[in-house]
Structure formats: C-alpha cells, structure tokens
Amino acid sequence: MQFTIAVALLCCAIASTLAYPMPDDMTMKPTPPPQYPLNLQGGGGGQSGDGFGFAVQGHQKVWTSDNGRHEIGLNGGYGQHLGGPYGNSEPSWKVGSTYTYRFPNF
C-alpha cells in the first residue's frame, strides 16, 4: 500500500514538472519568397577552318515592389568570334535594363 502511494506521488511529481504551458503561437513562420540566382545563358560553335564564335548573356532582378507588380532588372552580355580566315572580331558588349509591370486580373 505504501509502495503504491509512493509510486503515485512520484508519477504526480514527474507529471507536474513536465507540464509546460503551450506557446501562444503554434503556427509556422511564412516561407520567404525564393531568391533566384543570376540567370546566365551561353553558347558557341563554328565550322572547321571558320573559327569559333561564342556569346554569354545574363539577367538579374534587382528590385521588386511590395505588391509584386513592378520589377526592375539588369542584363548584359558579351560575344566574340575567334580565329578563322578574318582573325578575331572585336568583342561585342551589351548592357541594359528592363522594367516589368504586371497588370492585375479583374
């Protein structure tokens, strides 16, 4: 009898120490919007004895409005032809910016 009471009191003591109040906010934090890496594209090729041409382009979003409708991006590129009967061409550089507006759906 005394052993049963001792075990019951021990269980009550353990249960009271483990009983924590639940936190007020049990919801998960919202997932942040994805951060896309720099968008790079490239290519090249040529015929035998014709040299080799290649080009690289890139685009990066630099600003987006809070509502997501306005967006500004920067883009640039580089291209050149190497070798062939006329030798190397001058490098071709491209730099620009883009503005995008997304119309709301009515």
From Swiss-Prot:
Keywords: Antibiotic, Antimicrobial, Immunity, Innate immunity, Secreted, Signal. Residues 1-19 form the signal peptide. Changing residue 48 to T: In strain: B101. Coiled coil: none annotated. GO terms for cellular component: extracellular region. It is found in: Secreted. Residues 20-23 form a propeptide. GO terms for biological process: antibacterial humoral response; defense response to bacterium; defense response to Gram-negative bacterium; innate immune response; positive regulation of innate immune response; response to bacterium; response to hyperoxia. This is Diptericin A. The keyword Cytoplasm does not apply. Belongs to the attacin/sarcotoxin-2 family. Antimicrobial peptide required to resist Gram-negative bacterial infections, regulated by Dredd. It comes from Drosophila melanogaster. Induction: By bacterial infection. Induced in fat body cells by sorbitol and galactitol, but not by mannitol, probably by activation of the imd/Relish signaling pathway; sugar alcohols are produced in the hemolymph by hemocyte-expressed aldo-keto reductase 1B (Ar1) in response to oral infection with Gram-negative bacteria to trigger a systemic response. Transmembrane segments: none annotated. It comes from the Eukaryota.
